[in-house]
């Protein structure tokens, strides 16, 4: 009788431990399933005005970071000219941003929706390009570590800005598709070129294009606020 009770007690204890173990596993799975940018989930509670102000701050910050990275790059070019071959003229960038014609008869909100989608698509192009710049530079004989670190940091900032823009798009047109595709930069294909001079020049060209686009992007975020909040162009 006593032995039977002990066996039953041990089985109950084992069952309890198993349940606790399963509960912990499920808890960890739930934690692991939280999106990487879960902090952005709270932006759904922000007002449109608040999201736009946040986007303006982030865009300006990204523009400054890109300008700083470009300065570091040009300094590296100055002291290591044989690495980058900067004497060649720049080729055309992937496309001047925000040049697609939009009907003037559309409402400011419709124009705003179009502009947000364009900006999201453009940022996707930037993140793709920055990733490949950092990746290819890391395989150089003497990797420019500071430039690589800055490129990765800017990539993360851009992802945060994209998150805010998607929040804005959801405010002004809920359920709208977000994938307005931008063509990739032509120079990306040359980052893996067997021609060392061509490959290194591609970096120079990409940095210049990124700098030009970031300055235009900064002003367009401010224009977006004018269209959506004040119903006019500033």
Swiss-Prot record:
GO biological process: cell surface receptor signaling pathway; female pregnancy; mammary gland development; positive regulation of lactation; positive regulation of receptor signaling pathway via JAK-STAT; response to nutrient levels
InterPro entries per UniProt: 4_helix_cytokine-like_core, Somatotropin/Prolactin
A Pfam family it matches: Hormone_1
GO cellular component: extracellular space
Positions of disulphide bridges: 93-209, 226-234
Family assignment from sequence similarity: Belongs to the somatotropin/prolactin family.
Keywords carried by this UniProt record: Disulfide bond, Glycoprotein, Hormone, Secreted, Signal
Localisation: Secreted
Signal peptide: 1-33
Protein's recorded name: Prolactin-6A1
Single annotated GO MF: hormone activity
Glycosylated residues (UniProt): 61
Keyword Disulfide bond assigned: yes
Chief location bin: secreted
Superkingdom of the source species: Eukaryota
